[in-house]
């Protein structure tokens, strides 16, 4: 399924530098590249509990950063609500893409369904650049997705090609291969 990794040697046209920081606590955190010289570290999970602030009045960058942060919450409900809103704003900043890609290896099928339904609208040249720059993370996510399917969904969905997680990774890989052919 995975092609040889060939990273496009172009800078992403609209990439802006942002400093997003939080305390790193896990060896499971992943580093995602957003262009040739820039990367972000995404925590595996955050354990924040309690009341979340009303972010409706945040400016767009603060709102995006907060929603990205919530996609790492230990609660699947919080992650789903964050990705649901994030997917409507995704075109605002390139650094949002890795957070979406990280959620593609989830076991919560509602999250996967929501991402899959949105992918045709959000796959663009910048999104594909981020996929290509992070093919090792994509491969790890694919393996993780297979593992979750095997444990949680194989009985109900015996053909992995019918599993939404597989469909997501197929779209991602196909998109990355299309770029290299053009």
At which residue positions do the language-model features occur?
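Conserved hydrophobic register position within alpha-solenoid helical repeats
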Residues: 82-85, 111-119
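Amphipathic alpha-helical repeat scaffolds
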Residues: 67-72, 83-87, 101-102
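Amphipathic alpha-helical scaffolding segments comprising HEAT/armadillo-like alpha-solenoid repeats
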Residues: 2, 60-68, 93-102, 128-132
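Short coil turns that connect the paired helices of HEAT/ARM alpha-solenoid repeats
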Residues: 71-74, 104-110
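Alpha-solenoid HEAT/ARM repeat scaffold
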Residues: 65, 80-81, 98, 113
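Long, helix-rich interaction regions
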Residues: 123-182
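Residue-level signature of the C-terminal ends
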Residues: 88-89, 118, 122-126
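Long, acidic/serine-threonine-rich intrinsically disordered regions with weak helical/coil propensity
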Residues: 1-52, 178-182
């Amino acid at each position: 399924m995975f092609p040889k990794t060939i990273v496009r040697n172009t800078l992403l046209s609209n990439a802006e530098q942002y400093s997003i920081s939080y305390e790193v606590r896990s060896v499971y955190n992943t580093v995602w590249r957003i262009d040739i010289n820039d990367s972000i570290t995404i925590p595996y999970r955050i354990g924040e509990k309690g009341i979340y602030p009303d972010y409706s009045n945040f400016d767009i960058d603060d709102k995006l950063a907060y929603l990205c942060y919530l996609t790492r919450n230990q609660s699947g409900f919080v992650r789903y609500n964050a990705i649901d809103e994030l997917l409507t704003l995704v075109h605002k900043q390139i650094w949002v893409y890795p957070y979406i890609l990280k959620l593609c290896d989830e076991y919560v099928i509602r999250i996967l369904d929501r991402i899959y339904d949105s992918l045709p609208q959000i796959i663009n040249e910048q999104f594909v650049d981020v996929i290509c720059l992070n093919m090792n993370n994509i491969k790890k996510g694919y393996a993780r997705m297979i593992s979750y399917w095997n444990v949680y969904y194989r009985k109900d969905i015996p053909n992995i090609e019918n599993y939404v997680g597989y469909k997501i990774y197929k779209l991602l890989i196909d998109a990355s291969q299309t770029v290299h052919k053009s």
